[in-house]
Amino acid sequence: MEVYLSEHIAPSAYARLARHFEIVDNFDHPERLAAMVIRRAVVPRAVIAHAPNLKVIAMHGVSRDTIDTAAAAEFGVPVSNVPGLGAPAVAELAVADLLALNRQLKFVNNGLCAGRFDHFGAEEFVCHEMTGRTLGLVGTGNIAHRVADILRAAFDVRVLCWNPRRTAAECAAWGYEQVETLQELFRRSDFVNVSITLCDATRGLINAPVFAAANPELLLVNTSRGGIVNEHDLYVALTTGQIRAAASDVFEHEPPASDDPLIHLDNFIATFHIGGSTYESLERVSNRAVDYVFQYTGVAER
């Protein structure tokens, strides 16, 4: 039996698969596939429809947005995911981004590389401390909770949240104040963390009307999925002073073009989808995904 593996996984998980399956990196013979382990690869209907022996598509993470889930359901192929196991790593990146944005580290580094060393008393390098500020959460899943916990413990931040699927009482139980609109969240927050799933309802969710209402000192971090934040509108917001700075680990089209003006802004930090890239996260997530391969194929590990 063959298992399609789209990208690198933890060596321990790879070894488990290799002992029992032939591992392939292409869809040349979908009829031979018993399972797939997917990180970011696209799995279209055409592949699923021609894979009669496929028992499971095991996501190496949470989001299923690269999978034709309707086709998977039609052909009776479960799509598993691993919520929560990558949250510590992604939350650490989100917090690191906020710290770097607040201290303008990209701007300062670029200035130093250009020969500047005139920071003493220079107004453009002065910022507010993070203690006692307000964090806004777009989404209230595992990553959002982890970000809030870290920032509350370290900086005693107040937390607002936007999640129409939750009640005010549920948010209050977490110690958050629920707001009704994204515009209100962006207006009242000093920092906003985006941690929601990409779907039709969230595509382009954060856009020009939201930025128009924002606190001009706002720092925005997106470690969830590209497409949730409208990148053109974000560029306008960053270059016209609607918000102060932003960071993103994800893009609508990955990789973004090397000449994309957004990624070259001094007040924008871009990373290439590294949120889950810690040894610990990789170990947890990879092995849980492989657990599902064995579970659904019925192969007994030895």
Language model feature labels by segment:
Residues 1-80, 207:
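An N-terminal-biased, well-structured beta-alpha scaffold segment characteristic
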Residues 7, 161-165, 224:
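N-terminal Rossmann-fold cofactor-binding loop
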Residues 39, 60, 97, 194-198, ...:
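Short, well-ordered coil/turn residues at beta-beta hairpins
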Residues 45-48, 166-261:
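Rossmann-like adenosine-cofactor binding region
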Residues 73, 80-93, 101, 107, ...:
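C-terminal helix-to-coil terminal segments
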Residues 75, 83-134, 146-154:
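Phosphate-binding beta-alpha-beta segment of Rossmann-like dinucleotide-binding domains, i.e.
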Residues 140-141:
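Glycine-rich Rossmann-fold phosphate-binding loop(s) that bind the pyrophosphate
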Residues 154-172:
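NAD(P)-binding Rossmann-fold cofactor-contacting core
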